[in-house]
């Protein structure tokens, strides 16, 4: 169960990361559209799991390598944006959100 503070911080991070990816995402993912679908934050606000949806879909290995290379830059940009709202910028872990692919697969199976 998440507290009100966790919920507010996760929504703030989701909004600000969306803006960071809107500005920086073009150079990171070569023009692919990036959506921050969800942010889950630990109770101590020290770590955040960020779920991203990329269109057109990216390969998992390429996504992991790209995000590992750019995580510190993204965290720095996020820190510059939220420095007045949060005392500490959480460590970021990025995950590829495949829920849209799962929904499309279920929809395709139901149509058969």
Question: What residue spans do the PLM features occupy?
Answer:
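Charge-rich, low-complexity N-terminal segments
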Residues: 1-47, 51-112
């Amino acid at each position: 169960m998440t507290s009100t503070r966790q919920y507010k911080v996760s929504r703030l991070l989701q909004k600000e990361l969306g803006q960071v990816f809107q500005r920086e995402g073009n150079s990171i993912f070569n023009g692919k559209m990036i959506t921050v679908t969800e942010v889950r934050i630990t109770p101590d606000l020290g770590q955040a799991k960020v779920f991203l949806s990329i269109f057109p879909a990216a390969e998992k290995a390429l996504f992991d390598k790209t995000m590992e290379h750019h995580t510190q830059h993204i965290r720095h940009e996020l820190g510059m944006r939220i420095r007045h709202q949060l005392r500490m910028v959480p460590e970021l872990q990025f995950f590829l959100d495949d829920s849209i692919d799962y929904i499309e697969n279920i929809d395709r199976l139901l149509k058969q």
